[in-house]
Amino acid sequence: MLLAGTDNTPAKEVEYLRLFENYPVDGIILVGTMFTAGHRKFLKETKVPVVVIGQRTSHANCIYHDDYGAGKAMGQAVAGFSKKGVAYIGVTRDDKAAGAARDDGFIAGLKNAGVTLFEENKRTSAFTLESGYESALDLLESKCDIDVISCATDTIAAGAIEAIQTYLKKQIPTNAADAGARMRYILENTSIRVTGFGDNQMLKAVTGGIPTIHFGYKTSGIRGAELLLDSIEKGEQIPIEMKLGFRLVGADPSDSENLT
C-alpha cells in the first residue's frame, strides 16, 4: 500500500495519480478537494480502478457527503440562535463540496428562516487555521454587527476563535491556559458564536464543543475500500455514486440528522 499527501494541491494530485498508474498499483483511492480538467482526463483514460471520496464525479466510483443538506441544516440552526447578524467564512467554490455546496446550502438554510447573509459579511479562506484567523480578524475589524461566525471547516473555525481573542484583546487566565482550556475560555467570554463543519474531535476537546456537522468519514473510508476491492475483483463496471448523510451536533435545541 502506498500513501501520498498533497496538501490540497490539485496539480500534485494529478501528478501522483499518474505516478501510481505507472507504478503500477492495483487500485487508487483519491480523497479529493478540487476537481480540475487534469483530474477528469485521468479518470477517463486510466485503466486502474479508482474510487473518489469526498467529491461527486461521473467518471469513477465515488462516495460523497451531503454537503448541501449539511449547509442548509447549519444555516437553519444558526438562524435560530443569531439575534444580530451572521458571517460566513467559506472556501473556494472550485471545491464543489466544501466550497460551493456548503456555501449554497448555508445561504438557503438562512433564507428559509428569513435571514440574509450580506456580501460584506462573507470571506473566503484557505483550508488552514492561519487563514481562518486572518479572515475572521478581517471580518471583526470591519465592525460588522454579527453574533455568529460560521465556518466551512472546523479548522477554519479554530482560527476564527483565536481571531476573536486577538480582536477583544482579553488576557487568558494562567489557569485556563495551563489546563488547555484557552479556546473554551475565549468562547465563554464573548457574545460571538462560532460554528464549523467536520466535528473535529481535537477542537471539541479544547472548546467543549461548537455547533458543527458530523460527516461519516470513517464510513466513507470503509465503503471506499470495499468499492475498490470489488472493482479490482470484477473488472470494469458502471460507476457507482454513493451519497452519505450527516448529523448536526452542538446546536441544541435544533440538533438534527440526515444519515441516509
Model-found features: residue ranges?
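Flexible loop/turn connectors
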Residues: 144-147, 156, 161-260
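Short, Asp-centered acidic motifs that coordinate Mg2+ and/or phosphate
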Residues: 26-28, 50-51, 148
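Amphipathic helical "hinge" segments at domain boundaries
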Residues: 1-26
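Residues that mark the start of a beta-strand
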Residues: 49, 83-85
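Flexible loop/hinge segments that line or gate small-molecule binding clefts
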Residues: 31-73, 155, 187, 198-210
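Glycine-rich phosphate-binding loop signature in dinucleotide/nucleotide-binding domains
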Residues: 22-24, 81-82, 139-145
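Hinge/beta->alpha junction and helix N-cap segments in small-molecule ligand-binding domains
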Residues: 3-12, 63-73, 89-111, 115-137, ...
